[in-house]
Structure formats: C-alpha cells, structure tokens
C-alpha cells in the first residue's frame, strides 16, 4: 500500500467519478498517479483537465507534457485554453485563478468530483495569507476538504499530507512533473510565504505548518457552528419577500448582525459582502429614521434601505430617457432594464390601437377609476407600496397625450373600463431582484 492510501486520504472506493485538475506540477502529478493506481477510480470514470493559461512561453510544452503523461497512464485528458484578463484590477494571479476555476466548472460533469492537489503546506500558507488580511473564522478556515462546486463537488484529498510526503511519493514512483518558475517568484504573496516566511518559522518551530493547518481546521469547525446559527436565525429577521427587517435585526449584537448580513447575501448567491459594506450597513441599522433611503453597491449588486427594511438587488441597466415603443398587447414587451410588460386575457387579445410605452419624465397626471379629475402620478406612487427605485422604472402607457397606466400599479379609468370589459389585466414583471 503506498504512502497516500496508507494514510486513508485517498479512499479505496471513489466517492464519485473524479476529474483531476492536472497542471503538470509535482502536486497534481502525484495526485493523478495515486488515483490512477487505484482500480476503483478508473472504473468510475477517472479523467483529467489541464488549463492552458497562455501566460508562459512554455505553456504549449506544458500542455503537451500533460497529454503524454495521461496517455502513459491511460487517463483521458481535456486541455482547456482560457483568456486571462490582464486588466481585471485584481492582479494577474487572481485573474488566472478566476479563469481556471471557470474552466473547471465548465468542464465538470453533474455529480462529478473535481480533485485538487492542495496539501498541508498549502493550507498553512492560505491560513497565513488570510490572517494577514484580518480574516475572521470563515476566512481562517482556509481551504475546506470538500465543498459544492459548479455542478459537482470540489475535493482536496491531500490536505492532510505535507509537501515532503508528496515529494517522497514522486521519487518512489518515478513520477514526472514540470516546474513552473513563477511558483518561486517572491513577488507573489504566496510564494513569499512559501520561500521566505514558512522556512524561517519551521527552523524555529519544526511543526509550524502542522500547527497552522490545525488552526485552520479548528477555525473551520467554529465557522460551521456559526453558519448553522446563521441559517437558523436568518428567517427571524427576513420578511416573506426576502427583505431584512431592521427592527428584529437591531436586537442582535453587532457581531451577529454582521454574520446575518453576510449570510443573507450568500443565500441569494450574490457576490460576498465586503467589509466596508458591513460597516456601512451597520450605520443604517443603528439609524431609526423611518424615511431614510440609502444604497450600498458592489460588483453589480446593491443593498437599498426603505421603510425600515433592507433590499438586496441586482444592478440593472438604466432606462434611456427618451426610450419609447409601440405595443398592441399581443406579445410580451421586453423593457430596457430586463422587465416585462404583458396583457393577460383571452388568447389573441390586443388593444384596438397600439399604445405608446415610455419612460417616466416627471409631471405626469392620470384620471383614476371613479374620479373626474386627474392626480399627479408622483403623489400616487408615493402613497403606494412600491419602492422608490421601482417607481422610476415603471413603463407608462399612453394613448396620444392621455396617460393610461403606470405598469400594473396604477391604471386609469379609461383603461380600467376596457380591461374589465375584456376580462383582462396588465402584468408588469420587474427584473428579478437578488433576494
């Protein structure tokens, strides 16, 4: 039994079909070799993927090396070429990682497990990086052994092994690999920790990497317990529409409120809420002014306050001020921000004459059912339960110079009579919010 299986880190029975992320480096080469040496993985459909970033002059040669090694092992390999955004603002290393993970998610089959070759030394480096960024328990948990990923599961079976264990395996089994010179460039934060900091720590404390990895595991345990509490508490501070209610939120401590805010955002599959967002929203929670309206925006997402509630929204395209369209009601009208306008009734129903649909300009007036005089649309909308950011996106229906409706929220006497006569109604579907 080899050193990998002896430690029980590669189960003899595969948990699912496995896709190995194979860079060609020593770590992934050892992982691929160890899995290929176990018949159960082959029978379950073991395969590999190599991401060609195109960032190094030898990238083509590395892809060819991976193809040759997989051919020798009898393992199917898929080479995926990606374009790395050099102007992403997050740095080339982060951009390459994002492109790589997107390629993994696109390649992974439903129910398949993506095996990554991260080991204990990698875990220690990640823990230090997160600590230097002032992370809490969630961040200090570093890399989890497994978690949901794309259509399958991300799996790190080697987290309990030291880099030295992998090197010993590679030597014992004559595993061939390639060396990426960028992995030793101290300009990269992780490489600096790997080549400068950890060796110094291990010279003074030989088990430093083990201790740091163990601390990450303990933080992971604490994070799991806190997450369970978040899941149980979140329904007590959310309303049926998914908005956060400020009053019950105020009953919790600032630390718990911060966790609930992040859990609320995560539950909507929105980008993680940054620290400055937590601080900004904490000020909102502390302010009890009933008519206060504010917005915090990040990564095409925004949180807005209205009527003692917080709403999580996806950023949407603005309406061109002069936008207009003709619509006879026989098909769905797609609006500039992704919303839809429909005439619901008997099949084939349409207006006798096409109506004009326009964006709000201000100053509009409308005659309501049962009234003989007109009202300012602005005042009617202020009295409604429609949030202010939705009011500005209402499509206005006109017949010449007569305002007939503002979405499906306010309908004129004339259009209301026509809809009743045809057993019909307007339906305005706002673009889906994040929550």
Curated annotation (Swiss-Prot):
<dbReference type="GO" id="GO:0006400">
    <property type="term" value="P:tRNA modification"/>
</dbReference>
<keyword id="KW-0819">tRNA processing</keyword>
<protein>
    <recommendedName>
        <fullName>tRNA(Ile)-lysidine synthase</fullName>
        <ecNumber>6.3.4.19</ecNumber>
    </recommendedName>
</protein>
<dbReference type="GO" id="GO:0005737">
    <property type="term" value="C:cytoplasm"/>
</dbReference>
<keyword id="KW-0067">ATP-binding</keyword>
<dbReference type="Pfam" id="PF01171">
    <property type="entry name" value="ATP_bind_3"/>
</dbReference>
<dbReference type="InterPro" id="IPR014729">
    <property type="entry name" value="Rossmann-like_a/b/a_fold"/>
</dbReference>
<dbReference type="Pfam" id="PF11734">
    <property type="entry name" value="TilS_C"/>
</dbReference>
<keyword id="KW-0547">Nucleotide-binding</keyword>
<keyword id="KW-0436">Ligase</keyword>
<dbReference type="InterPro" id="IPR012795">
    <property type="entry name" value="tRNA_Ile_lys_synt_N"/>
</dbReference>
<dbReference type="InterPro" id="IPR012094">
    <property type="entry name" value="tRNA_Ile_lys_synt"/>
</dbReference>
<dbReference type="InterPro" id="IPR012796">
    <property type="entry name" value="Lysidine-tRNA-synth_C"/>
</dbReference>
<dbReference type="Pfam" id="PF09179">
    <property type="entry name" value="TilS"/>
</dbReference>
<dbReference type="GO" id="GO:0032267">
    <property type="term" value="F:tRNA(Ile)-lysidine synthase activity"/>
</dbReference>
<dbReference type="GO" id="GO:0005524">
    <property type="term" value="F:ATP binding"/>
</dbReference>
<feature type="binding site">
    <location>
        <begin position="23"/>
        <end position="28"/>
    </location>
    <ligand>
        <name>ATP</name>
    </ligand>
</feature>
<keyword id="KW-0963">Cytoplasm</keyword>
<comment type="function">
    <text>Ligates lysine onto the cytidine present at position 34 of the AUA codon-specific tRNA(Ile) that contains the anticodon CAU, in an ATP-dependent manner. Cytidine is converted to lysidine, thus changing the amino acid specificity of the tRNA from methionine to isoleucine.</text>
</comment>
<dbReference type="InterPro" id="IPR011063">
    <property type="entry name" value="TilS/TtcA_N"/>
</dbReference>
<dbReference type="InterPro" id="IPR015262">
    <property type="entry name" value="tRNA_Ile_lys_synt_subst-bd"/>
</dbReference>
<comment type="similarity">
    <text>Belongs to the tRNA(Ile)-lysidine synthase family.</text>
</comment>
């Amino acid at each position: 039994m080899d050193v990998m299986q002896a430690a029980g880190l590669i189960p003899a029975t595969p948990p699912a079909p496995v896709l190995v992320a194979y860079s060609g480096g020593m770590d992934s080469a050892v992982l691929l070799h160890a899995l290929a040496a176990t018949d159960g993985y082959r029978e379950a459909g073991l395969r590999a993927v190599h991401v060609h970033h195109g960032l190094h002059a030898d990238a083509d040669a590395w892809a060819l090396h991976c193809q040759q090694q997989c051919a020798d092992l009898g393992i199917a390999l898929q080479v995926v070429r990606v374009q790395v955004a050099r102007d992403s603002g997050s740095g080339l290393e982060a951009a390459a990682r994002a492109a790589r993970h997107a390629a993994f998610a696109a390649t992974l089959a439903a129910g398949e497990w993506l095996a990554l070759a991260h080991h204990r030394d990698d875990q220690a480096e990640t823990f230090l990086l997160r600590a230097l960024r002032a992370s809490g328990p969630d961040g200090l948990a570093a890399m989890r052994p497994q978690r949901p990923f794309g259509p399958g599961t991300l799996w790190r079976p080697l987290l309990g092994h030291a880099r030295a264990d992998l090197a010993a395996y590679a030597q014992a089994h004559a595993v061939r690999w390639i060396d990426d010179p960028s992995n030793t460039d101290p300009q990269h934060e992780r490489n600096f920790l790997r080549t400068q900091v950890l060796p110094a720590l291990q010279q003074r404390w030989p088990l430093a990497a083990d201790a740091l990895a163990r601390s990450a595991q303990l933080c992971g345990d604490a994070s799991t317990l806190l997450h369970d509490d978040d899941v149980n508490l979140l329904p007590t501070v959310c309303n049926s529409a998914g908005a956060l209610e400020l009053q019950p939120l105020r009953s919790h401590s600032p630390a718990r409120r911060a966790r609930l805010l992040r859990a609320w955002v995560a539950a909507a599959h929105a980008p993680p809420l940054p620290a400055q967002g937590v601080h900004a929203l904490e000020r909102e929670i502390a302010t009890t002014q009933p008519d206060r309206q504010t917005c915090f925006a990040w990564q095409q997402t925004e949180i807005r306050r209205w009527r003692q509630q917080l709403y999580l929204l996806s950023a949407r395209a603005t309406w061109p001020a002069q936008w207009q369209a003709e619509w006879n009601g026989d098909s769905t009208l797609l609006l500039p921000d992704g919303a839809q306008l429909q005439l619901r009734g008997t099949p084939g129903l349409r207006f006798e004459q096409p109506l004009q649909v326009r964006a709000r300009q201000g100053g509009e007036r409308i005659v309501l059912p049962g009234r003989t005089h007109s009202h300012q649309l602005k005042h009617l909308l202020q009295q409604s339960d429609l949030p202010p950011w939705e009011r500005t996106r209402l499509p206005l229906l006109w017949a010449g110079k007569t305002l007939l409706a503002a979405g499906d929220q306010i309908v004129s006497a004339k259009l209301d009579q026509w809809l009743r006569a045809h057993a019909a109604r307007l339906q305005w579907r706002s673009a889906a919010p994040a929550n």
